[in-house]
Amino acid sequence: MLFRSEGDRQGLAGVVHATCLDGLYLVPSDRNLVAADFELYGMENREFRLKALLDQVRDQFEYIVMDCPPALTLLTINAMAAADSLLVPIQCEYLSLEGISALIEAMDRVRAGLNPKLELEGILLTMFDERTTLTKQVAAELRSHFPEKVFETVIPRNVRLAEAPSHGQPVLLYDVRSKGAEAYIQLAKELMKRVVT
């Protein structure tokens, strides 16, 4: 999308799609996004390509949410250069602790060189299983290092959350009464309190 929209001059507005939910729009990607990092390396202003596209439509939306891969790729750097803040989902696993350290370092570099307004909105614990010692340890470690940033809401391991994408639906449409859907509703409430205050 980053490159197709530039090539045919339709801009980002030409690839924004309405959904069945009022006020929710998507810009879909596909498997060709894998090659985007390679293409970006040869471009001028490569860290600001996504920001330039978002600036075309930013005033048309109250919030723009970008879902990024967990790897620190040039696409992720583009998202950080364009973002106001980051919401970082962390699986409750040991290696996630190392990953958050690398992400915070990258965020600091982006803030220093590309986007001084970038903030850490919060850290979201996912794949949370309160029955395991590891989950409790990871949660405690993150809460001790980032006391104001870890959301109270946690996203549990949940079968319905895992099933929903295979049915082409968000969990709130697939099974709104599931524990996973309830957790995301609670997260939205907690996030809005943070954003509004």
Region annotations inferred by a language model:
Residues 1-197:
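P-loop NTP-binding core
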